[in-house]
Each structure stands twice: as structure tokens, then as C-alpha cells.
Amino acid sequence: MKLHEYEAKELFSKYGVKIPPGRVATTPEEVRKIAEEIGGPVVLKAQVVVAGRGKAGGIKVAKTPEEAYELATKMFGMNIKGLVVKKIYVTKYVEVEREMYLSLIIDRATRRYLFLASPIGGVDIEEIAKTQPEKIKRVYVDPSVGLRDYHVRSIVLWLGFKPETPQWRQASSIVQAMYNIMVDYDAELVESNPLAVTREGDVIPLDARVIVDDNALYKHPELEKALEEDPRDVSEFEMYAKKIGFHYVELDGDVGIIGNGAGLTMATMDLVYHFGGRPANFLDIGGGASRDVVKEALKVLLRHPRVKVIFMNIFGGITRADEVAAGVEAALAEEGGTKKKIVVRMKGTNEELGRQMLAKLGIPLYENAEEAAQKAVELARA
Amino acid sequence: MTVLVGPNTKVVVQGITGREGSFHTQRMLEYGTKVVAGVTPGKGGTTVHGVPVYDTVEEAVRRHGANASVIFVPARFAANAVLEAVDAGVELVVVITEHIPVHETLRAVNYARSRGVTVIGPNCPGLVAPPVRTKLGIMPNNIYQTPGKIAVVSRSGTLTYEISYQLVRAGFGINIAIGVGGDPVVGLDLAEAALRVAQDPDVEGIVVIGEVGGDAEERLAKMYAEGAINKPMVAYVAGRTAPPGKRMGHAGAIVMLGSGDAKSKIEAFRAVGIPVAETPFEVPQLMARQLKR
């Protein structure tokens, strides 16, 4: 779950980090009201969970509440990288002296927490890694040891602060807060970019990003609730898929893909691409899918406006071919048939039974996945 | 013998009375696996498919000499199940369970490693070794009937079955197939699994099945280039068409912070002389060429 900036900032604040005063608004009137309350120039920040909002026009400075109102009328409803702006975070404008980068992730290779720190900030870490890789410091923290004094010291020194100054202490407490948020909230990412030194000399997270592990959401009911009320970057199809129990990712082609297992489904997409086609989606029915899951999954693609051909690639083990065929039959019955072409390749458990069931529906079963993929691509072109 | 399991591997199934645990215990027994005990707290004293059930792993180990464990416990309790197995003294733990919070996996896996225990998974199909008729996992039995000299290490389940099937059809036999798991943090990662199987004198060739996310494939390529592995290898990487920032079914299959895309993995393999199959179906052909058959 990707937290909005205002939610992430609230977390930082909860952990004792000083943040610029601000509130989130859902209407231009509210934006004006908050701007009046804060007083002076304010920043309007579109709350969409993508990087690079600024360049896309999602961050604006307003000198007066009236200007804030005007800007907000344009910003609400704006489409930024596929996401519609429904919330605007209005915060006090602060003059910035210096920008840094600080993030915390889980390092897969060492199985430790990893801080990435750079005295240059405001741009993506990819950008820094490309242009000035020597500026990135990596500090690993073993989860069984936890964050220690010396970890914090090496990060804060690297960011350019002098020991035992007020700024040093502020920066240290931000490092500590980020670590605590990471652990307490089961986060995959805690980032402050830019982390800034203001004209007044305060160290503050000017922007904040937190991504919480979806598998741990049950431990944080308040976040679960927030996600339900505001699904952020999850499409309607993806929400539906999650409810039924399969994985769905939207892509932009016209060949609908259904597979079982993440790896095989990705390989099926790649196969379609290999033969010159374009996958419309990734849809993994998972292991041991029942006919109901197959039915609901297929219905999604039958109704999908962009999908011309549906290519199912099932390698049965726990998943049974007859169960899959029954799901196909039920989906077609509920939809009253379809004009879309369906290409099925199925191997494994109860294959023969599945073949007979599909034959009755006039759907031929392919033994060879390459042949089936070629056929699907050919039909999509026709 | 294989590197991870052999004739003396005695298995305890944690979560044996659940739907999955019970179903796959039967399949493991049918395959020939020595499943000696099961564990479900509160169900001690019962049996599942003739296998005695205990309340603790410690008891299963004490009474039956179990030295390996397969975990089918629900996600909320699975990390604890790993810790329990480690403390009970087993040497190998296979975690089938999906959706374990990654911070919990992190702690459990680190604890196990500090005690010298090998963890496969979580979110994995497990491992199967046809030469010793032993399976700790959920792979379909019928594909793993032909023992031989090819090791398959993979981040995916069904794709492992698919490629194993293609290998067997092409006349190869399997020494061991290990699905290391689709989560971002796993006990034994793809690179370590390849390194382990390479140490087996019975293994002639290694098939590596990678996917988007992380850098295990790149690390493996580096190990190969440095000579840590000196056996013929063939790779396949799933997810060439996966868009950045989206999880492709597996929690670990995500292109993030500018790294982990299929292209860089494929390039890393090719740069060190490991051929990469364009499709899963090309793997046997490439392996035959590697082994000069």
C-alpha cells in the first residue's frame, strides 16, 4: 500500500519529526480555507502516489488564498501519469537552503535493512545513481541488532552535518524516526526526498513517501480502512481481482492473458510478445484455482473493451484441467457467449476430460504453447 | 544423494491437518518421501494418512528423528513455525506459505541462517529430488519420474514444472528441482541455490529460471564469471514485458528503484557466457548444446 504524502508526513510527525504545517483538502474551497489558516504563501501538492508529480504540474506555489483557490480548481481532476487528483495537500511554503536524499528499504541480497543517503536530493535515486553514484552512501542494519548510534552517526555525517549541532540532532532524530516507522509499520520503503535544510535552519522532510507491505496490512487496520476508502493506484479491475482471489495487472495490448502461477503467466505474456503480439494484461489465477475463480477471471477479459483474443495457458498440477474447462463453460454461459476468440493451451491433471469439455464449446485445445501463442497473435491481427 | 536431501531425510509436516497440508502430505507419501510426523497445535494424538500428529515440532523430532520440515501453516503463524522448526533442531525448512509479512520473513530467515539451518521459501513450490524419490513441496509427481543429472533452480512454481516437463520430454533426467520462492526475501536465494547444486558431483547441467525483481540473477552471473560455478548453465528470465512499479503476481516480482528488469538480467547472463532461452521451450535445446549432446 502506497501512502499519500500527507499520510506519510502524519506518520513522521507522530514519531516526533517537525513538518511544515499543512492539511489535506478535497475541494477548492477547502484549499482556500487552509491557505487562510496557514497564512502567507502555500504549496499545493497533488496527492497522487507517483513519483515526478512536480514536473507533471502537480506542485504549485500560491501567494494568496485566492490564488490557491484558482490553482486548486485546475489541479483537482487533473490526470497525472494515469491517476486523477482527488486530494490536494496544502502546506506552508518554506525557503530551502539545501536538499538531500534519505531512504530506507529492505535489501534482498543481504537480508538487512538498508539506508541510502545522499547529500544531493530532490531527484530520483536512479538519477543520482546514474550521474553521481559516489554520492550515495549505503548503511546496512541487521534486523536482529537494530539501529544503533554508529549507524545514525555515519548517515548524518555523510549528509553533511557537524556533530553536536542542533541540525545534527534534528537529522539524527529523523533517521531514528524513519527506522521506527519502517519496523513498526511493516514498511517496504520509507523515504524523505528531499530532506531539506530550511532558510531558518531546520532539518525537515520536505516530501515523504512510505510503502507498507500489503501482506502486513492486517496488523494495521487503520491503513486497511484508508486503502478501502481511497484505493489510490489500484484500478477497478485490480480491486475486483483481489476480491475474487487472482492477480491482475493492466497492460496496453489486445491479447488477454490468463495463466496459472506468476512465472508461467509472465512467460505467457512474453511468448505473445515474442510472436509479435501485445499482451493486454497479466492475469494469474494462482495455484489450484476453482472453477469459480476461472469463471470470474475469464469474465473480466470477456468484458474488457481492449481485449480481442483471450489466450489461456494452464499447466496443471494442483490446478485441474476439467475444473478450468468448467470455469470457461460457466463464464460463457453467464455472458451469453462471446464474439472474442479464445485460445487454450492446457497440460497436466485431467487434461483429457478438460479437452472434451472445451471441444463441446467449440474451443480447440492446444498441446503446444508456442503454437497456441502464434495462433492467438494471428487472431488478434485478423 | 543430492545436496539438500537424501535417503536419510525424514520429514515433519507443520500444518498437516489443514486442507493443503493434508492433501500434499498424501502426494509426498505417494512420491516416496519419508514423512515421519505432522504437527498441528491442539491436534496431537491424531493421524493424517497414517502419519502421527504432534502438538510441537520438538516432539516430532524427539520421537521420529525428523530432520527436515515442510510448512503449510497460514501466513500469520508461518514465521513462528520456522522459528519453532529451527529451535527443534531440523536442518532444512521448506516454507510453502504465501503472504507472510516480509519483516517477519526477514527475522525468521536471519535466525535460521545464524543457526546454520537452510530455509527454502517462503512462497515456494519446494524441492523435489527424483534420484532419492523425495519431495518436500507441492510439485506434480508425474513430471518428476525421471532421475538424471539436470538441476533446476527457479523463482517460480508452474514455470518450473513447465520447463522440467520440456527437459524430460527432450530426454533429460532431473537431479533436483528447487523453487526458491517468489517473495522479496527468501531463505536460499536463486544465486545460493545454484551454487549449492553446482557442488553436487551428480549434477551435469543447471537450468536457472529467473524473473523480474531484485538482483539475484545478476549476482549469480557474477559468481559464474568468477568461477564459483563451473558447470554448464542455461537461463530463462520471465517478465520481459512486465511494466515497472507493478507486482507481477509474486511479491518479489517488481521492477523498483530503477532495477530488476528482465533486460538487465538477460544481459548479465549473456555477458558471462550463459545462454538465455528466448522462450521456455528453447531450454532443452540450449542445454543439449551446452552439454555437447
Swiss-Prot record, chain A:
Enzyme class: ligase
Subunit structure: Heterotetramer of two alpha and two beta subunits.
Family: Belongs to the succinate/malate CoA ligase beta subunit family.
Domain ATP-grasp: 9-240
GO molecular function: ATP binding; magnesium ion binding; succinate-CoA ligase (ADP-forming) activity; succinate-CoA ligase (GDP-forming) activity
GO (cellular component) term, any one: succinate-CoA ligase complex
Enzyme Commission number, as recorded: 6.2.1.5
One of the GO BP terms on file: succinyl-CoA metabolic process
InterPro entries for the chain: ATP-grasp, ATP-grasp_succ-CoA_synth-type, ATP_grasp_subdomain_1, Succ-CoA_synthase_bsu_CS, SUCC_ACL_C, Succ_CoA_ligase-like_bsu, Succinyl-CoA_synth-like
Keyword annotations of the record: ATP-binding, Ligase, Magnesium, Metal-binding, Nucleotide-binding, Tricarboxylic acid cycle
Residues bound to ATP: K45, G52, R53, G54, V94, E99
Pathway involvement of the protein, from the record: Carbohydrate metabolism; tricarboxylic acid cycle; succinate from succinyl-CoA (ligase route): step 1/1
Record-given protein name: Succinate--CoA ligase [ADP-forming] subunit beta
The species this protein was found in: Pyrobaculum arsenaticum (strain DSM 13514 / JCM 11321 / PZ6)
Binding-site residues for substrate, renumbered to this chain: N260, G317, I318, T319
Cofactor(s) essential for the protein: Mg(2+)
Annotated Mg(2+) binding sites: N193, D207
Reaction(s) the record says it catalyses: succinate + ATP + CoA = succinyl-CoA + ADP + phosphate; GTP + succinate + CoA = succinyl-CoA + GDP + phosphate
Free-text function comment from the UniProt entry: Succinyl-CoA synthetase functions in the citric acid cycle (TCA), coupling the hydrolysis of succinyl-CoA to the synthesis of either ATP or GTP and thus represents the only step of substrate-level phosphorylation in the TCA. The beta subunit provides nucleotide specificity of the enzyme and binds the substrate succinate, while the binding sites for coenzyme A and phosphate are found in the alpha subunit.
Pfam families associated with the record: ATP-grasp_2 (PF08442), Ligase_CoA (PF00549)
